[in-house]
Amino acid sequence: MLVLHPALYEIIVRARDWRLLDEVAKELGMQAESLMRYVEEGRAKGVLQVEKKVVEVYELTEEGRRRAAEGLPEYNFLKSATCDGGRCVVSLSHPEAGVALANLAKFGVRPRGGVVELDEETYRKILSAVEEKQRYLSALEGAPRDVLQEFARRRIVRRVERTLIYVKAAVPPESVRPAEVKTAITSADIATGRWRTYLLKPFDLGVEPPEYPAPVPHFFNEFLDYVREVMIGLGFEEVRGPVLEVEFWNFDALFQAQDHPAREVHDTFYIRWEGPIEAPPEHLLEAVGRVHEEKWRYKWSREKALNPVLRTQTTAVTIRALAERGDGEYKVFTIGRVFRPEKLDPKHSMEFHQLDGIVVGPGLTFKHLLGQLEQIAKALGMTRVRFRPAYFPFTSPSVEVYAEHPKLGWVEFGGAGIFRPEVTEPLGVRKSRVLAWGWGLDRIAMILLGIDDIRELFTKDPEKLREYYARWVKYRSATGSTGKSYTL
């Protein structure tokens, strides 16, 4: 008994007499093209007869597919008729009236006085003929030749040549059986000889692998680098600091009392750390502790100030820079991750990025601060920005900064203010004033790129990454730093 590939065996079973290969493929739930290799194999082995016949057939054009879905102009025109008292009226204001009338002329349809008016019996006969023509668009094989010729003139269908393949079994189906297809054999198959009854599936190494879209840079990393470029273009110098910070730089140096609610465990990640910790200079510990005890009127704890935490704000980095540089005229910024015990939702995350900056110099005012904030916002492409009065422990006066999101409306993305003397003086800054701000870059990216869920900034979906990168490229090409030198 001859052993055949299962697909070839199924063709032979179904083709005891001449059958169209398309019909056999449909019964097997396969495409006719995928069966061709088995048809050729059957012919080569002499178990299958094959005949090919070239025929002319009609197929829908793109316009034909549209008309099949939306309706022929004359069909839509007639369906808009209003019938009353045995008369049917169609207004010539119909958008397809011109084309419809050209195709209805053979029925004797003529406009008069801005309308087409027909007795209802005539209207029904014409509509029935047009409906039949409309149905043929979904079943071209049953359409009369004159209808097909009309469709061809209207470029609704086109005539093409197709090769029809007919197959017929050359041997009784009982004389063959299907093989068991294997992609691998075991040592037991070889030892028992079962491998002789298997059909090993060949691997065609010449087949090209499927194309996969080229990877794109991560849009959010590109955005962060761009913000860095903008800040440097505005004359700022970048500074950096540790993610694992002591409470002193994260809170105490910013005149945030040690019993402030923001320092509770529900707002700060406290770290159990047995490694070395870089303590702040002794003179700063003493100066900051003295200001806390004098102004907040409580016993300041040096031990608490040295507790390790994951930084909750990148102001910890800029306050370090201020302590190191002291008085003078300079502008610094930092970009980095911060951490807070937030519940993850479309607007909040327990880990996000901040842009922090300070401008140091004598005679700086609140007006300078708002001007600097507006300058940065416009450099990043945010055209609609609002400021609202706010309170922060370490700045006065203070504002919250909002920008308009296309879906979420006005979204707060940062705070700003002028450092209080209780912050600057313990650090040795007495002649200068310090403008300071901290902005949430995740929310800014959402605003600029039209993203309404903060979790999408870290998506791993390749399709979404390509979509958001395309938005980034569009934004980047239309907005941003022009290389100009900006001054306060």
From Swiss-Prot:
InterPro entries for the chain: aa-tRNA-synth_II (IPR006195), aa-tRNA-synth_II/BPL/LPL (IPR045864), Phe-tRNA-synth_IIc_asu (IPR004529), Phe_tRNA_ligase_alpha_bac/arc (IPR022917), Phenylalanyl-tRNA_Synthase (IPR002319)
SUPFAM superfamilies recorded: Class II aaRS and biotin synthetases
GO cellular component: cytoplasm
The protein's required cofactors: Mg(2+)
Major location (coarse): cytoplasm
Keywords attached to this entry: Aminoacyl-tRNA synthetase, ATP-binding, Cytoplasm, Ligase, Magnesium, Metal-binding, Nucleotide-binding, Protein biosynthesis
Catalytic activity as recorded in UniProt: tRNA(Phe) + L-phenylalanine + ATP = L-phenylalanyl-tRNA(Phe) + AMP + diphosphate + H(+)
Cofactor: binding details: Binds 2 magnesium ions per tetramer.
Protein localization: Cytoplasm
This enzyme's EC code(s): 6.1.1.20
Binding site for L-phenylalanine: 315, 354-356, 394, 419
MF GO annotations: ATP binding; magnesium ion binding; phenylalanine-tRNA ligase activity; tRNA binding
A Pfam family reported for this protein in Swiss-Prot or TrEMBL: tRNA-synt_2d
Gene Ontology BP terms: phenylalanyl-tRNA aminoacylation
PANTHER family noted in UniProt: PHENYLALANINE--TRNA LIGASE ALPHA SUBUNIT, PHENYLALANYL-TRNA SYNTHETASE
Family, similarity comment: Belongs to the class-II aminoacyl-tRNA synthetase family. Phe-tRNA synthetase alpha subunit type 2 subfamily.
Subunit relationships: Tetramer of two alpha and two beta subunits.
Name of the protein described by the UniProt record: Phenylalanine--tRNA ligase alpha subunit
